[in-house]
Amino acid sequence: MARDARKRTSSNFPQLPPAPDDYPTFPDTSTWPVVFPELPAAPYGGPCRPPQHTSKAAAPRIPADRLPNHVAIVMDGNGRWATQRGLARTEGHKMGEAVVIDIACGAIELGIKWLSLYAFSTENWKRSPEEVRFLMGFNRDVVRRRRDTLKKLGVRIRWVGSRPRLWRSVINELAVAEEMTKSNDVITINYCVNYGGRTEITEATREIAREVAAGRLNPERITESTIARHLQRPDIPDVDLFLRTSGEQRSSNFMLWQAAYAEYIFQDKLWPDYDRRDLWAACEEYASRTRRFGSA
C-alpha cells in the first residue's frame, strides 16, 4: 500500500482518492454472516483503507464546507424486506448487518467524521418477545463480530442509549468495543441501542432537577447549553444530515435534540438493499441545499 494511500486529495476535498483497481472490494452480501476481505496492512501502523464498493465506484468530490460532519441514519425496512421474500423478519435484520459495515466504509471514503446509527429504540421493546430476544442477541453479536474490522479502519465505536432493560451482555460488548477503539479518530460511530430522544431529554432534565434540589445549580441560569451538557454523550455535535430508509417520513424519536436543524432526506430503499452509493447520493443532495438555521 502506498504511503499516501489514505491521504486526502485536498484539504478542501476530504474524500479519499480512488482506490487502486486491484484493491479489495466489499464482499458478496447475499450470504450471512458476510466475511470481510483481508486488507493490506497500513503503513506505520495507521488505519487501513476501507474495501472499495463492488462496483469500484469512487466517492464523489464534495468540498469540506458542503459535506455533513454528522450523519444520523434510521436504518428502516429490515422486516419488510424479509416479508416481501417470504422470510422471517429476523432474516432482514441479518442482511442489514453487512450494510452497516458498507455504510461505514462509504462514510470514511467521503470524509464524514460522525455517524449515528439507530440500532434499537426504546419503543422497540413493544415488538414480539421473540423478535426482541433476537435483536438483543443480534446487536451483541454484531458488535463482537465486527469490532476488530472497525478498529482496523480507524473507527471509534461508542454506545448511546439507556441502561434500564438493556441486556447486560449487550452493554458489556459495547464497552469492550468502546475501549478497544477509543484512540481511533478516522470516524466516530455512535451505535444507538435502547435509545430514545425523549428518554434522553427526560434523563437530562431529571439530573438537572437533582442539581437544582441540591443547591448546585441556579434554575435561573439553566440554558440550552445546560441541557446539552447533561445528554448521554454531550460531545456529540449537532446532526447535519438525517437519513431514513424505506420511504417512511418520520424521525421516530431519534436524536431529537441534536437534529433540531438537520437537513432531512428520506430514501425509498429498504435497509438491506441500501449501500454506500445511496449515502453518497444523499450527501450530494445535502451539499446542494442552503441551510439557514432560522434566518431569512
From Swiss-Prot:
Its EC number is 2.5.1.86, 2.5.1.87. The active site is at residues 76, 124. Residues 1-24 are annotated as: Disordered. InterPro entries: UPP_synth-like, UPP_synth-like_CS, UPP_synth-like_sf. Binds 2 magnesium ions per subunit. Can also use manganese as divalent cation, however calcium and zinc ions are much less effective. Catalyzes the sequential condensation of isopentenyl diphosphate (IPP) in the cis configuration with (2Z,6E)-farnesyl diphosphate (Z-FPP or EZ-FPP) generating the 50 carbon product trans,polycis-decaprenyl diphosphate. When (2E,6E)-farnesyl diphosphate (E-FPP or EE-FPP) is used in vitro, both primary products decaprenyl diphosphate and (2E,6E,10E)-geranylgeranyl diphosphate (EEE-GGPP) are synthesized. M.tuberculosis does not synthesize (2E,6E,10Z)-geranylgeranyl diphosphate (EEZ-GGPP) and heptaprenyl diphosphate. This is Decaprenyl diphosphate synthase.
